[in-house]
């Protein structure tokens, strides 16, 4: 998986690129939270749930069903708070949440992503894995491998995100 901070890159770059008239700050904040939400499944380790279990890491919280239903619930509960239209809220939140499993699918480790849950327990990777998988232990980020993880995230997520943000910003000017 990319680091939890890097999962925020997609909604952050899209939201800032489109500007606060299109993506109000509250909606941007919710998008960032939803982009990080699927990794709450690591808490299942504390309860003895195995990594490869459907309720383990990269299981149902990384599924397409989760990525489409959770934003829908958020929109119905908080649409007025987001200060944006129903469809805009749902689209932004869905892209934000879906980006999480897409980024996880291009990492060099793990057991894949449970995109098709509840129809299948099979895990998937994208055809290419370019992002170094992030270690769970914070202490590992000070090692040479941790530095490689940070560099790969900068190169494959943050740099393209910043370019997209710049193009969106330039287009609206």
Curated annotation (Swiss-Prot):
TM annotation in the entry: 13-35, 55-77, 84-103, 148-170
Main subcellular location of this protein, as a coarse class: membrane
The keyword Transmembrane belongs to this UniProt entry's keyword annotation: yes
Record localization: Cell inner membrane
Membrane-related topology note: Multi-pass membrane protein
Topological domains, Cytoplasmic: 1-12, 78-83, 171-173
Protein name per Swiss-Prot or TrEMBL: Inner membrane protein YbcI
